Amino acid sequence: GAGLRDILAGRLDTPLAAAHRNPEPQVAEGLWLGAREEVHAMMDLSDGLASDLGHILERSAAGAEIDLERIPVAAGSDLRTAACGGEDYKLLFTAASDAAEELAAAFRARFGRPVYPIGRITAGRELVWMRDGRPEPLDWHGFTHY
């Protein structure tokens, strides 16, 4: 991710580099989300959004449309790194769309941090990046182990 990029470039004192060196796995958050019946699938973003969402979609026999403008980008980073970088220890989950607002409010109340809805699950079998409501042809992939 962006923190590793900073470290490799010799920028060791940036907030992104510090976050990379001192990850905070979201165990309590994962346990809480995993107990919610409106949450359908979940995993950490160790290999990046593009790769890890692909794993969820493959196992779920589903597709997704991801709104590029809704992906959170850390200060000092960029959209491609946010979508393809890994080792973030954040959680990626899918939930019932009719429960999303209530789930986000309950998460914020419990953990003091927001949930970022970035798209929707579709009946198709592909990941489609969207910009301004239109498909954006991007060949973005996260980390692959082999």
Task: Locate the predicted segments by residue.
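Short, acidic (Asp/Glu-rich) active-site segment that either coordinates a divalent metal cofactor
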Residues: G1-W32
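Glycine-/charge-enriched secondary-structure boundary and capping motifs
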Residues: L12-P15, A35-Y146
